[in-house]
Amino acid sequence: MLQTEMKVIQQTEIADKVYELILTGERVADMSPGQFLMLKPSRSDLLMRRPISICSYDKTAKTCILLYRIEGDGTRDFSKLSEGDTIDVLGPLGKGFDIDQTPAPKTALLIGGGIGVPPMYQLGKELAGKGVQVTFVNGFQSAKDSFYEKEMNAYGTVHIATVDGSLGTQGFVTDITNNFPEEPDVIYSCGPKAMLQAVKASFPETKTYLSLEERMACGIGACYACVCPKADDAKKQFKVCEDGPVFRADEVSL
């Protein structure tokens, strides 16, 4: 059973309503880039778990970092956790990013939007460790919403786009990527559906992997709450939590 208790090491608000939650537990040993955890709120009236992507992990220290934004009662409940508290966790879950491709890529473009930025961090770290030249492009609404630029700079070049122009390039992530002189060997992206659609349309010939953000209820493929149409047959569907959340761009219809 993937259900376990994890202990809170530290929690900090790092951007507007965005929290960095550091946990420790035995399940860290099983984590890979692009997976997620289903966290159970402590309030008895909040029955459903909430999916939170894994930002990073240290298997030696048995710690992992989750970044999440307060969106409702569940995530607001998580924001009250402090050092020494425990939380009921299901996971790690899902199929993450393919980082052992053949032939190995020389360059990788990692595109994250909003709360889709966190899983790009561990992915970029591991790709850089394999000798891949990593470029991060992160999109936010405003400077107050941005995070992890310094941390990502340790593993690659970081570009920032904000809708209001308060940090980096004004506009969207594609306003940056469309001006790159060369296409990368591989693209990985996570963020809102509109952003993923734009990324897919901008790089039709490049091997691209998309991590889908969908509302989930069970996290294990039992409830069919997070389905996505297949590209080759719209009548058939993937279960994002079980078959994904990461898919090749040509597999899914967005």
UniProtKB/Swiss-Prot annotation:
Name what cofactor the protein needs: [2Fe-2S] cluster; FAD
Pathway stated in the Swiss-Prot or TrEMBL entry: Pyrimidine metabolism; UMP biosynthesis via de novo pathway; orotate from (S)-dihydroorotate (NAD(+) route): step 1/1
Q: Where does FAD bind?
A: 50-53, 67-69, 74-75
GO MF annotation, one: metal ion binding
| UniProt key word Kinase | no
Q: Which InterPro entries match?
A: Cyt_c3_hydrogenase_gsu, Dihydroorotate_DH_ele_sf, Dihydroorotate_DH_Fe-S-bd, Dihydroorotate_DHASE_ETsu, FAD-bd_FR_type, FNR_nucleotide-bd, OxRdtase_FAD/NAD-bd, PyrK_electron_transfer
Note accompanying the cofactor annotation? Binds 1 [2Fe-2S] cluster per subunit.
What keyword terms does UniProt attach to this protein?
Answer: 2Fe-2S, Electron transport, FAD, Flavoprotein, Iron, Iron-sulfur, Metal-binding, Pyrimidine biosynthesis, Transport
Domain FAD-binding FR-type, by residue range, is 1-99
**Positions bound to [2Fe-2S] cluster:** 218, 223, 226, 241
Q: Name one GO biological process term.
A: 'de novo' UMP biosynthetic process
Q: Which residues form a coiled coil?
A: none
**Subunit structure of this entry?**
Heterotetramer of 2 PyrK and 2 PyrD type B subunits.
Q: What does this protein do?
A: Responsible for channeling the electrons from the oxidation of dihydroorotate from the FMN redox center in the PyrD type B subunit to the ultimate electron acceptor NAD(+).
Family the UniProt entry places it in: Belongs to the PyrK family.
What protein name does the entry list? Answer: Dihydroorotate dehydrogenase B (NAD(+)), electron transfer subunit
Source organism of this protein record: Listeria monocytogenes serotype 4b (strain CLIP80459)
